[in-house]
Amino acid sequence: MTTASPDASHSQPDHHDHHEHTHGTGVHSALESQVLESLRAVIADDDVRTRLIDRVAYASDASHYYNVPKAVIVATDITEVAHAFKVAADHDLSVTLRSGGTSLSGQASGDGLLVDVRRGFRNMSVQDNGRIIRVQPGVTVAQVNARLALYNRKLGPDPASESAATIGGVVNNNSSGMACGTEFNTYQTLSGLTLVLPSGTIIDTSADDADAKLYALEPKLAEKLLQLQRRVKDNPESVGIIQRHFAIKNTMGYGLNSFLDFEGPAKILEHLVVGSEGTLAFVAEAIFETIPVAKLATTTVAVFADLHGATSALPDLVGTGAATLELMDAASIKVGQSFDDAPQSILGFDVDKQAALLIEYHAQTADELAEREHIGQKLLGDLELFKPSAFSTQTADRNSAWQFRKGLYAKVAKARPSGTTALLEDVAVPVERLANTCAGLQELFDSNGYEEAVIFGHAKDGNIHFLLTDRFEGEDNLKRYNSFTDDMVDLILSAEGNLKAEHGTGRAMAPFVRRQYGDELYEVMQELKQAIDPRGILNPGVILDEDPAAHISNVKLNPTVEEEIDTCVECGYCEPVCPSKDLTLTPRQRIVVRRARAKAEGQGDYATVAELDKDYEYMGKQTCAVDSMCLRACPVGIDTGKFIKRLRREDSNTVEQSVWK
């Protein structure tokens, strides 16, 4: 199916208008009736949603950004997505595609049309005895791996958010994770995509005649892709920059390594879409080559005297074939010591400057595992550890180690003061520069007053995450965060690193893409975007943004609401298990709406309060199953079901009191 290409001379949506006003909610949708009629000519009336509660519910993803869409479209098939693109182009509206909403850089929220592609795209098909899987964008990584487990295989990408992260986001953010590195990430394990371009053209890049079809349906685009490839490959400096940045984890900007790694416009396009964060096309289906599941593992948490000691050991540990090397700084160890089932190696001492490495080896046979463990244990014996460390194949010991590593984010986020927002950032540098980079980050935390910040991450890949909390209200706090960001950018780029390793450029790093790649490659990215999306309808402000303050615009403000839900980080882990997720609201959305209500009430916007209250009665209260399944999935231990029960009791008490008056 194709539609006429939009007139490239038509004005692009101005995505900067929203920088000043989207924190307000506003009772009425800003969409004109003509736009709604156009959308509903193909999409069912109930699936084009403009009520305030629907729009506010989708204003947040897992990041620290907040954008209220003008309408939410629940797409049921590929035709409806293509139609939404056409209507958006005809009426100068932006389109944000959303599935799991676990994005950490702001790429899953927008102020135009938000198209939910989770509900209608949940099919998957296993082929070749599990070696290949075709999967639609609304399926979670955990669901895919559960199907593949029957064949003792799994996806290469292993994001920590696998329970909620969906394939649409996995492709669009080039997801990797703790074990896959750059060898088994999305870019490396993908073998085909079915794409809907902004023009409405549908291309299956896995088809034998994909190049011919792309030339037939989009001749200018096909030729432009090859022209950009020649431009890149003929410039030795550009080739060197691309090779350096993509030698380690990198989700900054577009995947220009596609121009070096592939021939033919369809395959180049396919891999450019990987990591494009919904700015180039809709991924209607992805085909992955899967990898074997390791049957056996041995694990330890080794404590070093300081970060330098831990990071200095990395090259030798990588050389032993370690599957996982996870770094935790002193602040992380201090947090970990409070865990109920903390690893013994991090207990029994006062934390000063120590650092820890979670080291794990994988194998298919017991003999192979024993050999790897022997090599690893011998190396640890030669290193200067703060205290002795031993490997274990016991499930309880492995669970304890991983609870420590994976529980850090939740523990710090849960302990943050009410009303603050948690920011989880990630960067990557060459492994040999990791020690100095971590030391530099700690200095920046101290100089900017982020005393509670912690550093952890995938040390094997030179990829570290850091978590800090702040209350983004007032000029002083925004200036502090802006100053920290500028200094952090200088630190990472001076180490020849990448400003985003896993989480995507999003809105958080869009103003800094030019600084990482230089003017020439930034222009290549601009021309690529213009060639595929001439009207700029897909996710404007994400990846490319000339506004130097874009990263501090529309920052999420989390007012104090109710004690039971104040610690919510809006990660979305609760959503896949919620019985009402396809009927009304999810636990995350119930909390997002309560926060919007509290903010409106604080501003004296009682029309918004009344509008939200009216619809929350059914959407938020009556349709909640109150089975507390969300509690089991929530990393910070929020029981939204219990919270809704309290609201129901209060409503009941109010009715009883009015009867007896």
At which residue positions do the language-model features occur?
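Conserved phosphate/anionic-ligand binding catalytic regions in large, soluble enzymes, centered on
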Residues: 101-104, 170-177, 266-290, 457-463, ...
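A glycine-rich phosphate-binding loop feature that marks nucleotide/adenosyl-phosphate handling sites
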Residues: 53-56, 104-106, 161-168, 252-255, ...
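Activity-critical C-terminal alpha-helical subdomain
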Residues: 411, 511-560
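N-terminal flexible segment immediately upstream of the FAD-binding catalytic core
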Residues: 1-86, 90, 102-131, 160, ...
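C-terminal substrate-recognition/cap domain of FAD-linked oxidoreductases
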Residues: 50-52, 58, 258-266, 270-483, ...
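Mobile "lid/hinge" segments at catalytic clefts and subdomain interfaces of large enzymes
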Residues: 167-337, 351-357, 584-605, 629-631
